Amino acid sequence: MFALAAVLASLAGCMTAGSQPAALSTYANPVLDSDFPDPAILRGPDGFFYVYATQGPYEGGMLNIQAARSRDLVHWQRLGDALPVKPSWASRTQDFWAPHVHHADGRYLLYYSAKPDAALTDPSRGLCLAVAVSDRPEGPFTDMGRPLQCGESFINIDPMAYDDPATGRRLLYWGSGFGPIKVQELAPDRTSFAPGSRPVELLHVNSSDTPDNYQRLIEGAWVIRRDGYYYLFYSGDNCCGPNAHYAAMVARSRSATGPFETMAAATGAGNSVILGARGNWLAPGHNSVTEDAAGDHWLLYHAVDTRRPRTRASDDINSRRIMLLDRLRWRDGWPYVEVGGPSTGPEPAPAAGFGPRR
């Protein structure tokens, strides 16, 4: 598998801006073999899939918001830093996490979280939600000059913007830090919350100590609509380090703002996990979802390769989370991954191109 992954990585690095890779019959994980946590996908108007990731090292430097693009979800071309200039209120910190880019009203909005400079002298200050804007999907994005919302610890992270096709409302999902996953309506400018709106709590943590409980911490919200249901994908419980224990889960609702029912509550399963550890892949999760040209759904997510779990040998805390891809299937109104975890060998490749929007 390493040999095939190396070939794919080489091909991805050689792609030019207008190149179209040959159609694939199979692929193998990983699809991007470098630290690329919390991947969030966007379908661009130029025929490319764009993906954005948490701050990470690349070619001897540190990228605040990582970005890459692909025509087929397998060959990825690195694009450098989508947020090359830090915001004025977070110019001296290094925590730029879990971006999501939303295309609306002729511009691209980058929702992300960052640690404010004030936190360097006041430990009670936690991460903030933020918004940056660009006229191109690859950036550069320019921060709006103020945080969207701040709070304690890391409860205000992992934003995902979503336009509800049923109501036309502009929504923002977010949450982590042992708190709930929430949603709140955005104002028409999409850079502030709608006047008078309040956050709605959708999912809550479960403090049980059972080994199969991944909801002691929940984060990484991603929403899609299918056959009259809104599916809220989320992850938990510990992404990183020597005690990493992480998986992707799902809940659903008839409304974008809930109430959501977890798969476990609906089916009686022991938990709501659709993607857990398998083989040499540890702590998979924080997924995004897209469709290929055949209309099949695909999960892009990060996982830790136990054969090379660290970005730096001396760093036992920050795991090397690389990007994987697997097909999402459906049964009885619920999504699942064929083997319950990351694929470990050649798999049928996505149909290159875009599927229908839902």
Language model features with spans:
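Carbohydrate-active catalytic/glycan-binding domains of CAZyme proteins
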Residues: 14-358
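Bacterial N-terminal signal peptides
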Residues: 2-13
